[in-house]
Amino acid sequence: MTPPVSKIWTGHGKVPVALIRTGWDKGEGFYVGIKGGTASANHAHMDAGSFVFEAQGVRWAQDLGMQEYYSLEKEGVRLWNGDQDGQRWDVFRYNNFVHNTLTVNGEKHQVKGAVPILATYTKDARLGASLDMTSLFGSNLKKATREVVLVKERYLQVTDQVQAAGQPASVRWTMVTSATPKLLDSHTIELTKEGKKLHVIIDSPSAAAFSVVDNVPSHSYDAPNPGSVRIVFDVDVKAGRKETLKVRLVPVVE
């Protein structure tokens, strides 16, 4: 099969996605998946704004995937109540707290929020997409956009621009990984997996600091998540103010 000419494909359906692939041989190039959409879609999770990232044949930023429905239904979980306060969103793998997206004021995403792809970048120097995430956060934020871009086929850059509404907002940045994390400094985490390394670097804001959170389930009915963690940082945004969260994922070439 002949590889496609374009290194990026974008779909603008109810659950819009942008997919980047720069190589077609095993272990070669980069793979990026960027997801918009809505939790109100059939079988959806609260994962709008999420991304996955693969480099050097290693999946660095991952999605834990769904939990098998029967394992929840046999425990009496009201899985098909998809209202804002429905029990579906208490399932560990289904809400936004354990996806590679933003969380504001510790709250779940708005079920009826819908994240469109605003723009797609198709040049080799910048491959990626931007998303409007505003509707996920209700009255907590006035504006929120995310840009996920593969820069010069060297590293992935994730840029979030947020503006608080009429009250302060606490914004959490999250990335799920099955790599082994090592904190090099407050702004840099080194991930190691399958003999390869990746640096995750906070470029902005300067006061932000990484921490590592175990993916220990919240309830007895939740599936275990062995070998995976979340790397997170929190940013406090004053009422009405704007803030930029900028993170680089840089493969270490040795």
Regions found by a protein language model. Name each.
Residues 61-64, 69-73:
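Cytochrome P450 core scaffold surrounding the K-helix E-X-X-R motif
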Residues 36, 64, 104:
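Active-site donor-binding loop signature of nucleotide-sugar glycosyltransferases
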Residues 71-254:
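CBM-like, beta-strand-rich accessory domains located in the C-terminal region of large
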